[in-house]
Structures are given as structure tokens and as C-alpha cells.
């Protein structure tokens, strides 16, 4: 899905452009990813978040 609304991480300003109009930095998508109870990659995201390596 293509998101239209974007946010500058430095200025906390919302825009529709890929770069911030004030500071010129790259904007990010402020929306969280969708949740699925049947997510195959949940353990890898938890591993990245906690900084722990899980041996599969």
C-alpha cells in the first residue's frame, strides 16, 4: 500500500513530499505496519527489537 502522508523526523512536520521543505532531510512514513495474528516473521522483529540473536 502506498502511503501519501509523510513526516520529517527532525522537524516533526507532516508533508506529502519525499523530502522536508524546511530542512531538506528525507521524510518517513509515520504509520505502523499492519498486524496479522498469523505473522511468520514476528520472532525476527522481536529479535531485532531486543537485540537478541535467536538460533533457528
Swiss-Prot record:
Pfam families, alphabetized: Nop10p (PF04135)
Cited InterPro entries: H/ACA_rnp_Nop10 (IPR007264), H/ACA_rnp_Nop10_sf (IPR036756), Nop10_arc-typ (IPR023532)
A GO MF term: snoRNA binding
Protein's UniProt keywords contain Membrane: no
GO biological process per UniProt: pseudouridine synthesis; rRNA processing
Cross-referenced SUPFAM superfamilies: Nop10-like SnoRNP (SSF144210)
Keywords from the UniProt entry: Ribonucleoprotein, Ribosome biogenesis, rRNA processing
Highest taxon listed in the record's lineage: Archaea
Xref: Gene3D superfamilies: H/ACA ribonucleoprotein complex, subunit Nop10
GO cellular component, one term: ribonucleoprotein complex
Function: Involved in ribosome biogenesis; more specifically in 18S rRNA pseudouridylation and in cleavage of pre-rRNA.
PANTHER family documented for this protein: H_ACA RIBONUCLEOPROTEIN COMPLEX SUBUNIT 3 (PTHR13305:SF0), RIBOSOME BIOGENESIS PROTEIN NOP10 (PTHR13305)
Family membership noted in the UniProt record: Belongs to the NOP10 family.
Protein's name according to its UniProt entry: Ribosome biogenesis protein Nop10
Lineage start: Archaea, Thermoproteota, Thermoprotei, Sulfolobales, Sulfolobaceae
Amino acid at each position: 500500500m502506498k502511503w501519501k502522508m509523510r513526516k520529517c523526523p527532525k522537524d516533526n512536520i507532516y508533508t506529502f513530499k519525499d523530502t522536508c521543505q524546511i530542512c531538506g532531510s528525507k521524510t518517513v512514513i509515520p504509520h505502523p505496519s499492519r498486524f496479522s495474528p498469523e505473522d511468520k516473521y514476528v520472532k525476527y522483529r522481536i529479535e531485532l527489537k531486543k537485540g537478541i540473536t535467536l538460533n533457528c
